[in-house]
């Protein structure tokens, strides 16, 4: 139905000047628009119906049932098109006769509509005039309030900023003072700690204990390497079958792909 509604909307929005604009012929009459509307409406119903059938057939239930509704719908649409072609002359003759028989009626209706329009137009103009005046009056009343609100908000922000600026500067100054004082208090202890550490390292380097530590470290590393060697060998042996299997799978996939390419 969305397609139908869209088609109807386009038809009425384009109005009687659409064909005149594109085909450069005389503007359509109301009667011609009614006939075109009927034709376009039927085409839209047919197209939208096919869309719904397609959606159903592509659904899980439609695939399971396998009703082949789309083929049947296309056959039905083809049959309907043939019937429309066959009855086209008869239909045109009907529309022509009906249009001829209702000429006087449509003329009277158009005359009545024009008369009603003339009577109603002053009220419409008055309504539009008053509405525009009310909108302008409302705008004039609201504009000063909006300006006052904007100016008030800006003023309050400025006042708040002026009050907070000294406080923020004072806090930054106090924090800087505390950091400087802490650095001053810690400086002697930092120097003492660096001196003690340097002395310990120098004594360790000059004494026999440094060589002892170095020898022990080398011994520990060698022992670790000997202990890790069997574990690394076991790991290598365990990975060999896995790597071989991966290699076989890879080449098998390559051979299969090659065969498929050669057969094409």
UniProtKB/Swiss-Prot annotation:
The entry's function note states: Participates in the reverse transport of cholesterol from tissues to the liver for excretion by promoting cholesterol efflux from tissues and by acting as a cofactor for the lecithin cholesterol acyltransferase (LCAT). As part of the SPAP complex, activates spermatozoa motility.
Q: Which GO terms describe its cellular component?
A: chylomicron; endocytic vesicle; extracellular vesicle; low-density lipoprotein particle; spherical high-density lipoprotein particle; very-low-density lipoprotein particle
* Annotated positions of the Methionine sulfoxide modification: 109
Locations listed in the record:
Secreted
Q: Where are the sequence repeats?
A: 67-88, 89-110, 111-121, 122-143, 144-165, 166-187, 188-207, 208-229, 230-240, 241-264
Name the predominant localization. secreted
Family to which this protein belongs: Belongs to the apolipoprotein A1/A4/E family.
Q: List the cysteine pairs that form cystine.
A: none
**What keyword terms does UniProt attach to this protein?**
Cholesterol metabolism, Glycoprotein, HDL, Lipid metabolism, Lipid transport, Lipoprotein, Oxidation, Palmitate, Phosphoprotein, Repeat, Secreted, Signal, Steroid metabolism, Sterol metabolism, Transport
Gene assigned in the entry: APOA1
Q: Does the keyword Phosphoprotein apply?
A: yes
What GO terms in the biological process aspect are recorded for it? adrenal gland development; amyloid-beta formation; blood vessel endothelial cell migration; cellular response to lipoprotein particle stimulus; cholesterol biosynthetic process; cholesterol efflux; cholesterol homeostasis; cholesterol import
Pfam hit, one: Apolipoprotein
Q: What is this protein called?
A: Apolipoprotein A-I
Q: Which GO terms describe its molecular function?
A: amyloid-beta binding; apolipoprotein A-I receptor binding; chemorepellent activity; cholesterol binding; cholesterol transfer activity; enzyme binding; heat shock protein binding; high-density lipoprotein particle binding
Description of how the protein assembles with itself and partners:
Homodimer. Interacts with APOA1BP and CLU. Component of a sperm activating protein complex (SPAP), consisting of APOA1, an immunoglobulin heavy chain, an immunoglobulin light chain and albumin. Interacts with NDRG1. Interacts with SCGB3A2. Interacts with NAXE and YJEFN3.
This chain's source organism reads Ictidomys tridecemlineatus
Signal sequence: where?
1-18
Instruction: Identify the stretch(es) annotated as 10 X approximate tandem repeats.
Output: 67-264
